[in-house]
């Protein structure tokens, strides 16, 4: 079984790299061991979120012996951290890899990469981030649902995100997103980092919903969109 896992993830890695290179992109980060693969890439395309604050398009992939996820990836140049847009329509989740012939599994990955490379995927993500940069957040109404999910990852994660958020002069949804993704950048555990980058992407895309409070404050209501379940 171990030999199969190594072969499958190696094939996926090579296919991913080929697809990215064919589109003038480059692989920026790779973690690969038998049965587990994390890889991120970027392309030359850029968008400006604020003055002198540019983001770069990309694709991120995670694969194990039983599943793979391929999503659009947005890399913020000024802080060198990225967000995984797991809720993008162009993203693909591929279950039951271990029941597919290698060629078929690799073909599905190639198709997923192609989907995530669509220019509309990056344009939509950049516009969502611009919108997030214009919306201040309420610590309790907006942030608490996300902080609860952060605490589920690790007891210290939520506290670290809050510290980073309040240390920066950006009290918007975009600022909150970047507090999460900057912590992801500095996290050594690959699974935790991926989940933080996914959560950062979700913060960017979640639309404010009216709170029933009398003062008319807005609250974000995140949906639980963790997708495929991976074993560590």
Locate predicted features:
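Amphipathic alpha-helical segments
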Residues: 2-26
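A broad "ordered helical/assembly scaffold" signature
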Residues: 1-2, 35
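A short acidic/basic microdomain associated with nuclease active sites
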Residues: 21-45
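Intrinsically disordered, low-complexity regions enriched in serine/threonine
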Residues: 29, 45-232
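Residues at beta-strand starts and edge strands
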Residues: 11, 35-37, 55
């Amino acid at each position: 079984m171990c030999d199969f896992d190594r072969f499958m993830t190696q094939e996926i890695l090579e296919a991913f790299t080929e697809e990215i290179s064919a589109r003038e992109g480059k692989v920026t980060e790779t973690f690969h061991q038998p049965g587990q693969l994390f890889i991120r890439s970027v392309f030359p395309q850029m968008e400006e979120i604020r003055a002198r604050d540019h983001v770069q398009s990309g694709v991120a992939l995670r694969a194990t012996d039983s599943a793979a996820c391929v999503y659009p990836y947005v890399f913020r140049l000024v802080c060198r951290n990225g967000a995984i847009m797991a809720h993008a329509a162009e993203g693909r989740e591929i279950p039951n890899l271990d029941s597919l012939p290698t060629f078929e599994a690799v073909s599905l990955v190639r198709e997923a990469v192609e989907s995530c490379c669509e220019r509309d995927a990056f344009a939509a993500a950049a516009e969502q981030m611009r919108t997030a940069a214009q919306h201040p957040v309420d610590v309790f109404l907006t942030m608490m649902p996300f902080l609860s999910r952060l605490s589920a990852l690790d007891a210290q994660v939520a506290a670290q995100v809050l510290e980073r958020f309040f240390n920066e002069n950006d009290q918007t949804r975009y600022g909150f997103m970047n507090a999460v993704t900057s912590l992801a950048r500095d996290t050594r555990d690959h699974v935790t980092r991926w989940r933080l980058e996914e959560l950062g992407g979700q913060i960017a895309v979640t639309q404010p919903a009216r709170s029933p409070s009398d003062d008319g404050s807005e609250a974000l209501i995140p949906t639980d969109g963790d997708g495929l379940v991976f074993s560590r």
